Amino acid sequence: MKNKVLIGIFTLLLFACGSGEEKKEEKESMNSRDEIRLKQYQVQGAKVYATYCANCHQQDGKGLASLYPPLAGADYLLENLPRAACIIKNGQSKEIVVNGVTYNQMMPGNPITNLEVAEVLTYIGNAWGNEAGLVGVKDVDKWLEECED
């Protein structure tokens, strides 16, 4: 009887220890998936940026004098990703302050999908020295539902 109990406890401990390794491997593979998604979003986001954004914000993300704000090193962008998602999708006609400079040029909304918003935010959030990391489409979905007019 004691042997059966000991074998049962040993088996339970063996499976409990083994599941920790599986979770560790699963977590590492999720990180790998996120790294792959980050790279994919950056590549696709660069295409979206070139099509819809670069004309005003320039290829180097430095903006255009006092007309269009920079995205490179932009405090507003990095501190307000949810608001940036809303601006990209819906446009903006209000005044905006970026790196201490006030801009009052209207920005039209863009006819792009929520996935493309996530991709372009990932691209500009990690280009030109910015370090925002991966912007997921689920985050963008949530942010766009909460946009203020």
Q: Where are each of the predicted segments found?
A:
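C-terminal motif of bacterial Sec signal peptides marking the signal peptidase cleavage site
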Residues: 14-16
